[in-house]
Structures are given as structure tokens and as C-alpha cells.
């Protein structure tokens, strides 16, 4: 079977620099698997890839409704990319609801493959179309897009009619038929997916008939693209110039889990992951639970508070305690996180942000927990906060969070978001020698036996204000522990007003001195630019790409990205002072902007997107253009609407 373009001239003529493909269908149609396989295949071919999974919030919305549509977007390219793409080049819509939910994102002239079988009157009604109207029969869509009507469900049934599978199981294979069509259109080989299907179903699940059926459907879709002659053009995307090394595809949650394991080895501590399931952080538990051979212990607690307290207990016992959650869970953990601050015990809290408040948008991304991570506890209760910028960066950020927690005896909040947690990218596998060991010394005390022996002082401090880490059971280091205020030095319970003020200042200064572990922030772009675009967390790729695009037009702009949110880099004040204007794009209502205004008197402008979606590159470009041209006006912040940043479309519609 030929799976590559055999005509070199044709391949060159149809070469693309990148392609953005989106699969969309019911949550049971296997769109996540199809997208994941296209990602894996493209990565193995040597493309750079970036993905954007999109899950419905409902466990199982009514079939055929817009609320139940599941999507997976893949951007594969012949150059380095940082986002899953602004516009869709090819949409595969498995039913009318998927078509309705995603057609607006397809570029003019883009490819739209629809599963014609499912565009029945019943399904059109479920999707909310007017009676008697079928969008794939509307000339405007045929004029606007390359619209291909393929009866995928019917063709899949015909391909598997002799498989011996039940009609229900046959229907589950139609995602592979659709994937086969995409593989033909974009000149992708089948072997990676065939190997995956064989290993998953024939080997691990001992269901070879399921593997055979899916492989047959995949090949049938591919051969349909090759023989039906309805697709006049075939495309190819060359390899990307990626530095040599061993690569694997990782999601943010997967990279974070591996980073936690690596940190435990660097510290020579066992990793105890204590958690309560919550979207979108649950995958971290799924990745760590099978890792017992790495000394990992997982504990699924009865609630968020118990999980947090268990992780603190692990730190008290002398090991690496980590807990994971999302926004609502972080709120529940708040009191116990304050206990970790008061007791000065090491613990890492992973918060995968999602749309809020309350239950909010459980499966959608947001950056709205920054204030909660920094200030969301009673009393003056500081904690270190780190925010990785990409799926692969979650690995390094996890190691740094553990390093700070273990060596400085304090809680650290690792603030990711749903976009980078579920998104994926090629990740260059590092060597163990790339990382410094996490050096830890435990407290030891030999009683003198004298009457005036002061005993072990658990709250004495070194130059970083770090207190000794005493492991229970070590003779001579017995001490009080708990949430009541401690006497400076001895750790005895104290209600003295002056002592409380001293200890409050010590706890704040202890976090501030972590700045000596934080590298200076680096600026990318024009040194003489007047405008700085400053971001944090997941929007990194969109910001960098937008700034590069603007600079290619000959306009001067610079950008930088915060990874350490508290304490911030020591040179940040100096960097901010160099620019006349600062733009802060963030997926919230301006939380970082307000922090920087209060801390550095920085009169920044905000680009605030609170839609459960990551930034489009174009949205940031438009905001930059408005500031450079002086058309921004007096607004402190602008909000994108339907992909556009318009100063005249900012009125709040009630």
C-alpha cells in the first residue's frame, strides 16, 4: 500500500508550511483518539506539533446536540510553532452539531469534510437548525469552502460488513475511517496508527477483532481518498528543523507527572501524590498511579481538605508530598495551605486552572486563580507561585517547585491551566545530568544532659530564613507542630503581639528571599521598542508569535514572560521602567495587571479574554496595533469579541 505521494513534482506543488486540522463530533465519536493519532503520526514524521483538545462539560450530553460536541485541533508544521493555530484549514464534522459548532473557525477556501450520513432531519433538528434547512445543501457554504460530502457512517459499515462485529461496535470505528481520509489528504503514513491499534486492542486488551476492524476502517478511509477522486488536491508538510535529540509527545499533565518523579529522584525522596479527582487535573493521578516502580505512592482522599492535609503529613514525615487540584479544590485547600505556611513544611500544590467561579466551565481553560494562589488564605499567608508556559515546560516547572519546597521548607503553588495541561507538543527528553541534585540536610540534635540544655530549636534559621527539617522519630529533635503561632526560635506556642508581628514578617521575607533562586527575566524583541507585551502561563505561544509577526512588518515591539509569579524576578522593576507602554494579555479580568500596578506602579493596559478559550494570535496582534497607532484610547483593558479587538465594541451588553 502506497502511503506517500509518489509524484515528487506534485508533492512540491502541494507543499504547505503548516496545516491545522480539527476533528469534531459527538463525545462518543472518538474525536480525541483521531486527533491524538494524527498528532503522533505527524510528530514521528518530524513535524512540530501543537494541539488543542476541546471537551464538553457534560459527562454525556444528548447525542447530536451542540452541547455534546467534542473536538480536537492539531497544528503540524514544517517550522517551529507555538500555538495550535488561529484558523482551521480542514474541518472533519461527524454530524450537524459539529458542523454548527465549528464551521465559523474554518478559513475561507478551507477543507470541510462532512459525514453526510448523519445529516438527517432528526439530527439537524437536534443541532438546532430550522426545519427544512440543511447547511450542506446551502450554496453559500459550497462557495465559501471546499465542501466534501462523504457518507462516512455508511461507507464504514460497508467496509466492516464481514467483520463479525455488532452494529454498535462497527459504528465506533468510523473515527478511523475519517482519520484515513485525513491521512490521504495530508500525505500521512498509516503505520503509526496501525501499530497503536494493534498494541492497544490486540495485545493489551486481547481483542484482536477490534484491532482488525479499526485497521480495516482506517485503510478504507485512506483508499476512499485515493480512489474516489473527489479530493482534487493532496498536501504535504515537510519536516521541521528541530534540534537533534530524543523526542516524545507530551501533554502538560503528563510532563508535570514526570517532573514530579524526576524531582523525587533528584532529592532522594519518595513521591506521595495525595489528591481528590477534579477536572482538568485528574490525569496527573492517572499518570502517577502506575509508576509504583519509581517509588511513587498515590492516595485518593475523600475530599480536597484531606488530600491537602495528607500531603502536609508527608512533608512532616520527611518525604515529598504533592497534591493536585483545580480552582474549586484550591479554595477548599486554603485553610490547610495556611497550615503548611504556619508550620513551614514542604508541600507542592498543583492547580490546573479552569473557568470559574464555582463549578464554572470545568473543561475550559482560564487563568483566573492567580489572586487565589497568591492571596486566597486567611491572615498574611505568603506562598511561592510558579506558572509554566507550555506543556513541555511543566516538566521543568515541577522540578523547580519541588526544589524550592524541599530546600526552603515552604509550600509552593504550581499554577498551570487547562490549555497547557491537555495540550501537547514534542518534548526533547533531557538527561539526568542536565539537573542539579536537590541537596537536603535533616536536623540532628544531641542533648547534652545538662540542666541548662536549651534543647532542639525547630525555628532557628539559616541565611535564607529556612528552618531545620526534623524527621519524627529522630531522638533529640522532638518539637511542637500545628497551626498556632510559634515563638521565634523555640517553636513554642506564643500569643505575644511583638512575636506575632516578627513571625509574620519572617514568613513574608522567607518567600521574598526565594528571589535569589529566580533567574532574571529576559526580553525578546527590539531593544529600543516603546511597547512591551508581558504575559504569564499558557498564552506564551500566542504572545511570542504575535510579537514576531508584528516585528516582521518592521514595527518595534518587545515581549517577556513571567514564570515566577511570587516572588517575581529581581530585575522586573528595571525591565518595566524601560518601556513607555506595557500590554498584559491574560485569560482573566486583569489579575496580573492589578498586581503589577500595585507592586511597581506600572500603568499597564490589559487584554482580557474570559471565554474558556486560549488567545488567538490575531487578537494579540490587533491589541498591539491599537497601542502602537495610538488608537487604544483611555480604556484600562479591552476584551476580544468574536476574535476581534475593537475599541468601539467594548460596551457591556446586559
Language model region names:
Residues 56-60, 119-122, 305-308, 329-332, ...:
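Short gly/pro/ser/thr-enriched loop/turn and capping motifs at secondary-structure boundaries
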Amino acid at each position: 500500500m502506497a502511503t506517500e505521494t509518489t509524484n515528487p513534482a506534485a508533492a512540491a506543488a502541494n507543499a504547505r508550511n503548516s496545516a491545522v486540522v480539527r476533528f469534531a463530533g459527538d463525545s462518543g465519536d472518538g474525536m480525541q483518539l483521531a486527533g491524538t493519532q494524527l498528532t503522533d503520526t505527524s510528530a514521528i514524521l518530524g513535524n512540530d506539533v501543537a494541539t488543542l483538545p476541546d471537551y464538553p462539560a457534560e459527562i454525556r450530553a444528548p447525542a447530536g446536540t451542540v452541547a455534546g460536541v467534542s473536538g480536537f485541533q492539531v497544528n503540524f508544521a514544517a517550522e517551529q510553532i507555538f500555538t495550535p493555530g488561529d484558523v482551521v484549514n480542514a474541518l472533519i464534522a461527524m454530524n450537524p452539531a459539529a458542523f454548527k459548532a465549528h464551521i465559523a473557525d474554518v478559513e475561507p477556501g478551507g477543507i470541510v469534510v462532512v459525514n453526510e450520513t448523519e445529516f438527517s432531519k432528526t439530527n439537524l433538528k437536534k443541532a438546532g437548525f430550522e426545519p427544512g434547512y440543511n447547511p450542506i445543501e446551502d450554496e453559500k457554504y459550497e462557495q465559501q469552502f471546499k465542501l466534501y460530502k462523504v457518507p462516512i457512517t455508511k461507507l464504514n459499515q460497508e467496509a466492516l460488513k464481514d467483520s463479525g462485529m455488532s452494529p454498535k461496535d462497527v459504528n465506533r470505528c468510523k473515527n478511523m475511517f475519517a482519520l484515513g481520509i485525513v491521512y490521504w489528504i495530508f500525505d500521512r503514513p498509516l503505520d503509526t496508527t496501525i501499530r497503536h491499534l494493534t498494541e492497544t486492542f490486540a495485545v493489551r486488551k486481547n481483542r484482536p477483532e477490534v484491532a482488525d476492524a479499526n485497521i480495516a476502517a482506517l485503510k478504507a478511509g485512506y483508499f476512499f481518498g485515493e480512489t474516489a477522486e473527489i479530493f482534487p488536491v493532496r498536501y504535504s508538510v515537510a519536516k521541521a528543523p528541530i534540534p537533534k535529540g530524543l523526542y516524545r509527545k507530551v501533554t502538560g499533565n503528563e510532563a508535570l507527572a514526570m517532573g514530579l518523579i524526576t524531582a523525587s529522584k533528584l532529592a532522594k525522596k519518595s513521591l506521595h501524590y495525595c489528591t481528590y479527582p477534579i477536572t482538568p487535573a485528574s490525569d496527573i493521578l492517572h499518570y502517577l498511579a502506575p509508576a509504583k516502580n519509581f517509588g511513587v505512592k498515590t492516595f485518593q482522599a475523600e475530599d480536597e481538605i484531606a488530600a491537602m492535609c495528607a500531603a502536609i503529613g508527608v512533608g512532616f514525615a520527611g518525604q515529598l508530598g504533592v497534591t493536585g487540584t483545580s480552582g474549586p479544590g484550591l479554595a477548599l485547600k486554603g485553610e490547610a495551605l495556611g497550615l503548611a505556611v504556619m508550620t513551614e513544611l514542604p508541600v507542592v500544590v498543583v492547580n490546573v486552572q479552569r473557568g470559574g467561579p464555582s463549578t464554572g466551565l470545568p473543561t475550559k481553560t482560564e487563568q483566573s486563580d492567580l489572586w487565589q494562589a497568591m492571596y486566597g488564605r486567611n491572615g498574611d499567608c505568603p506562598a511561592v507561585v510558579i506558572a509554566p508556559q507550555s506543556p513541555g515546560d511543566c516538566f521543568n516547572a515541577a522540578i523547580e517547585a519541588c526544589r524550592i519546597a524541599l530546600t526552603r521548607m515552604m509550600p509552593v503553588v504550581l499554577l498551570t491551566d487547562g490549555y497547557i495541561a491537555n495540550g501537547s507538543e514534542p518534548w526533547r527528553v533531557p538527561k539526568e545530568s542536565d539537573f542539579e541534585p536537590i541537596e537536603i540536610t535533616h536536623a540532628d540534635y544531641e542533648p547534652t544532659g545538662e540542666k541548662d540544655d536549651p534543647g532542639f530549636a525547630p525555628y532557628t534559621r539559616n541565611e535564607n530564613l529556612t528552618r531545620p527539617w526534623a524527621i519524627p522519630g529522630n531522638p533529640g529533635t522532638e518539637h511542637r507542630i500545628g497551626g498556632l503561632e510559634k515563638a521565634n526560635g523555640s517553636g513554642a506556642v506564643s500569643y505575644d503581639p511583638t512575636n506575632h508581628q516578627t513571625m509574620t514578617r519572617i514568613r513574608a521575607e522567607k518567600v521574598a528571599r526565594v528571589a535569589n533562586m529566580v533567574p532574571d527575566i529576559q526580553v525578546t524583541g527590539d531593544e529600543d521598542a516603546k511597547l512591551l507585551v508581558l504575559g504569564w502561563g499558557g498564552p506564551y505561544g500566542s504572545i511570542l508569535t504575535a510579537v514576531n509577526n508584528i516585528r516582521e512588518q518592521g514595527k518595534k515591539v518587545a515581549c517577556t514572560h513571567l514564570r515566577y509569579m511570587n516572588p517575581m524576578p529581581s530585575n522586573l522593576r528595571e525591565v518595566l521602567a524601560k518601556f513607555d507602554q506595557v500590554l498584559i494579555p491574560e485569560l482573566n479580568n486583569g489579575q496580573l495587571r492589578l498586581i503589577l500596578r500595585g507592586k511597581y506602579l506600572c500603568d499597564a493596559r490589559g487584554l482580557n479574554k474570559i471565554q474558556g478559550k486560549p488567545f488567538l494570535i490575531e487578537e494579540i496582534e490587533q491589541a498591539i496595533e491599537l497601542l502602537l497607532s495610538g488608537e487604544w484610547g483611555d480604556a484600562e483593558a479591552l476584551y476580544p469579541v468574536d476574535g476581534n479587538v475593537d475599541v468601539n465594541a467594548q460596551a457591556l451588553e446586559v
